[in-house]
């Protein structure tokens, strides 16, 4: 069973790319057409690549790995934090600090400092200090919490990273590639597919698109955790609320995909939807 449907992708606007003047020519193979100066991403390919990424994440986690969720742009911050937290994975949804991966030993020391300050605050360690000292320690704790709170329990570099917007997160992607850490990411029409190991062609600017695809990756993590625990295979299909009706041309895309599918709910991997 497919982990996400064409209808869910269309409802979330995953098929909308950037304006035709803002694109990376390397993305040409993932583009279906353009409409009103906007590139339309081939969602048949998106479905196929989602399956590949889902399987990789599930197997990685099932074998004891961790996935770091990265999305610092406003449209991704909430879903990245919520989905990573849901499955107990680390995340970065504020500013990426250079060296978070390549200089993790230093980052780990800052995490230890954060936990030390939290323990002091909770056990009365601030008592007996001047107001100025308490204010300084509180500010230090809050700053560390903002920048490192999402990775507080990350004891080592992750097995893979999930990225929303590889252009904005180019430092994170570069560090992962330098360390040989696989990158799973949304590829919008202005991105470079050569930087990503497991690409998912799609819209990385729309809140609902970023949320849907992040939820898919989190569901893969959840299924991997179930397998690791010996709980058997779970249903990783994300639940998406009904959206407003599709435009006529979007309905044609959906109809083409349905006709091409070998079975209900399956992913067609060889047929490109036809625009009417």
Swiss-Prot record:
CDD domains: RPS2. PROSITE patterns: RIBOSOMAL_S2_1. Gene3D superfamilies: Glucose-6-phosphate isomerase like protein, domain 1, Helix hairpin bin. GO terms for biological process: translation. Residues 254-276 are annotated as: Disordered. One of its GO terms (molecular function) is structural constituent of ribosome. The keyword Ribosomal protein applies. GO terms for cellular component: cytosolic small ribosomal subunit. Keywords: Ribonucleoprotein, Ribosomal protein. Residues 255-276 have a biased composition (Low complexity). The keyword Ribonucleoprotein applies. Pfam families: Ribosomal_S2. NCBIfam families: rpsB_bact. Belongs to the universal ribosomal protein uS2 family. This is Small ribosomal subunit protein uS2. It comes from Mycobacterium ulcerans (strain Agy99).
